[in-house]
Amino acid sequence: MFSGFNVFRVGISFVIMCIFYMPTVNSLPELSPQKYFSTLQPGKASLAYFCQADSPRTSVFLEELNEAVRPLQDYGISVAKVNCVKEEISRYCGKEKDLMKAYLFKGNILLREFPTDTLFDVNAIVAHVLFALLFSEVKYITNLEDLQNIENALKGKANIIFSYVRAIGIPEHRAVMEAAFVYGTTYQFVLTTEIALLESIGSEDVEYAHLYFFHCKLVLDLTQQCRRTLMEQPLTTLNIHLFIKTMKAPLLTEVAEDPQQVSTVHLQLGLPLVFIVSQQATYEADRRTAEWVAWRLLGKAGVLLLLRDSLEVNIPQDANVVFKRAEEGVPVEFLVLHDVDLIISHVENNMHIEEIQEDEDNDMEGPDIDVQDDEVAETVFRDRKRKLPLELTVELTEETFNATVMASDSIVLFYAGWQAVSMAFLQSYIDVAVKLKGTSTMLLTRINCADWSDVCTKQNVTEFPIIKMYKKGENPVSYAGMLGTEDLLKFIQLNRISYPVNITSIQEAEEYLSGELYKDLILYSSVSVLGLFSPTMKTAKEDFSEAGNYLKGYVITGIYSEEDVLLLSTKYAASLPALLLARHTEGKIESIPLASTHAQDIVQIITDALLEMFPEITVENLPSYFRLQKPLLILFSDGTVNPQYKKAILTLVKQKYLDSFTPCWLNLKNTPVGRGILRAYFDPLPPLPLLVLVNLHSGGQVFAFPSDQAIIEENLVLWLKKLEAGLENHITILPAQEWKPPLPAYDFLSMIDAATSQRGTRKVPKCMKETDVQENDKEQHEDKSAVRKEPIETLRIKHWNRSNWFKEAEKSFRRDKELGCSKVN
C-alpha cells in the first residue's frame, strides 16, 4: 500500500499542482525512435505512440493524445509521438498491430501496452496511465470477499478509500486515479466496476459512481466493522479532494470561546459548524450526543462541543445548539433542538453548497482553498510556465551522485518536485547559478528526492529543501540561511576559503582586519572576526575553531596564535583570549574578551555582533532583530534615511539611551509592505519621515514621535523619558492576533517542538572518525530504473523564515557529525 509511484507527490496543494516541468505550449513532441529512447531517464515515466504516418483512423487518437500532454506532464509523465521510418529497426515499428498500441515506459523498461481503442479520450488516457503506474496504491477487486480481506488487514493501521465506477477510463475513474496519485501513500485505495459488489455493501442508486471512506484505523477489535462515510457529491477531482480534507479533520473539537470567532477547516471548505452547548453537570452525556451528531454529519458539517461554563459571552439559557453558516458576516443562530434527528435535519436543510465547475484541461487559475491558504504554493503555481535555465546546474541521479561529489567541490540542492517550497527555492537556486556562471569553482548540482529517495536518505536529508556543500577532505556543510538568492549567493562565495583562516604574521593580521586580505569577500561579510590566542591556549583555540566551522558561509573568521600575539592584544586593548571584530562599513575594530567561553557561546557572541546598531529593516533580516524581544524604534523613510537623523539615533545608541529598544529604519521604496504597516498605525497617513515605537512583545502599543518636532538628540531623549514615565498616549494598540492552526490537531510545529525538547540538549560532538561520504554500491551496474523507490514520508517542510539561523546551522552540523563526520576523498 505504502510503496508508490513517486515521480512527484503533492503534499500542500492538490487541485493546483505545483509542478515545475510545465511546457510553455501544450503540443505533442514528434521524435524518431532513436531520439525517443535516448531521452528516457531512469525512474521517469513516458507514454509513446509509434506510427508510420498520420491516417484518418489515427488522427482522432492523436488529437486526444495531444490533449493528454499537459495533464500527464503535471504528474511528471512525458508523452511523445514516435515517427517510424523504413530504415528504423524497432519492435514497436514493426507489424500493423503494433502500430495500434501505445506504450508506457518507466526508464527504459516497458510497463504496459495499451490498445488505442481503450484510450478513447483524454480522460481514458490519463486514467489508464495512472492506473498502470499506481498498481500498489490502487487495488482492483471484483467480489465482497476481497474487500473484506483488505478491510481486515488494515484494521487499526490505515483507512480505506473505496470507489465504484461504471467502467475503466471514464471521467470518474480518472478523478479517483488523480486522488490516488496524491493520497495513495496515506490511504489504501480500492476500486471496483462490479455493481453486485456495490449492492452487497448496501449502496443505493448503483447506476452512479460511488466513493466511500472506510474508517479502519480507529478499529482495534478485528470483529468490528469499519465505519463507512459516503461522499454524496459527484466524483470529480476537486470534490474528492475536499471530501478527504473533511475526513482528515478532527471528528469533534471542544471550544470555550465565542462561536462567532471560531474558525475551522470546515468553514474554509464551505461547510457550516454545529456547536453542541454543554455544561459541567451534563458534560459526559453532551459529549456522547455531540460524537453521535458528528458521525451523522461527517463530510457535511463540523461539530464542536461548546463549554458554556468557560464562556465569556452570553448564550441564551435555553439554547442547546448553535448553528454557524459558512458565509461570512452571517450571525450565528441559537437553537433549541432536543432530538438528534432535528439537528441533522436543520443542518441538511440549511446547507449552502456552491457548485464548483471543474475544467480539467483549460488552464484556469480559479480560487483553490489550499493555494489561497498557502502563498508559496500559489506563487509557484502562477510562475509554473517560467522557463528556467536548468542547464546551468547538473541534475544528479543515484548513478551519478557519488562520482560527481567526489570528483569536484559541489553544491547540491536536495529538493522534492511535489513540494511548493522546494520549487520556489529551485528558482532562487537557478538565479544563483546565473550570477555565478563562468566565475565559480563550485559545481552547482541538484537532485530530486521524489525520484531518488535512497540517495537523499543516505545523505541524511530529513527536510526539504536543503543545500549541502561537499568539499574534498572536509565534512559536508548544510546551508541553514534564508531560502533566497542573495543569502545563498553569500553562503557560496564565503565558502570559497576554509575557516577559520590561519593568520601567520602581524602584517597579515592588520591586512585581514582592514579588509585588504580578502577584499573580494567583504561585499558578502561586512564584519571580519579575528580570534587572538597565545600559543598555549589549546582549548580556547579549539572552541574558536569549532565556532568558525559552524559559521562558515555566514561570516569571515580568522585566528592568530603566534608568539607576538601580545602586540595585537595591546594595540586593541584586548585581554587574551579575545575576539577582534572589524566592522568594515564603519571602519572600526572592537574587542571582546573570551575567558572561559565555549564554542556555542562564541557562536552567539559573533551572531549578535553581526547585527547592526541602526539597521535598515527588510523582509529578510527582520527575524534576526525581532528575536531580540525588544520594542522596535522604527524610522519610516521614503528613500535613504536623512544623515542627520541617523547621526542623532546612533549618538543615543552609543550613549546607551536605546539599550531597551531595537532602533532601525525602513525604506518604503525598498520594502513597500511598510506602507501597509503605516496604514495600520495611522488614519490618515501623515507625511514622512515618521519615527514610531512599536511594543510588539508586550501590550502591542504603538507610539508616534511628534511630527512637529525635529528628530534631534534632545527631542528624542525628552520623548523617551515621557514614554518611560507613562506621559505619552499611544496612537493605537495592535490586536493580539496569532497565526494559529485552524484546530489543535493541526498544530504540527508545537508537536515537533515538543518531541525535539524531549530529546534533551547535547554538546556539539567532536569528529571521532573519518569515513567516506559515500559507500561503494556493489549493485551500481544493475538496472535500477525498474525499482519502485519509496518516497520519503518522514520528510518535513523546512521552515520558511529562520529567525535564528545559527541554531539551525548547529542542528545541521550535528546531523552531519553524527553520520560519522564523513569526508569526501
Swiss-Prot record:
Keyword entries, A-Z: Disulfide bond, Endoplasmic reticulum, Glycoprotein, Secreted, Signal
Stored SUPFAM superfamilies: Thioredoxin-like
First and last residue of the signal peptide: 1-27
Subcellular location, record wording: Secreted; Endoplasmic reticulum lumen
Predominant subcellular localization, coarse grouping: secreted
Locus of motif Mediates endoplasmic reticulum retention: 816-819
Region (Disordered): 762-787
Sugar-bearing residue positions: N460
Subunit structure, as described in the record: Interacts with FOXRED2.
Name by which UniProt lists this protein: Thioredoxin domain-containing protein 16
Organism, scientific name: Homo sapiens (Human)
Organism phylogeny: Eukaryota, Metazoa, Chordata, Craniata, Vertebrata
GN (gene name): TXNDC16
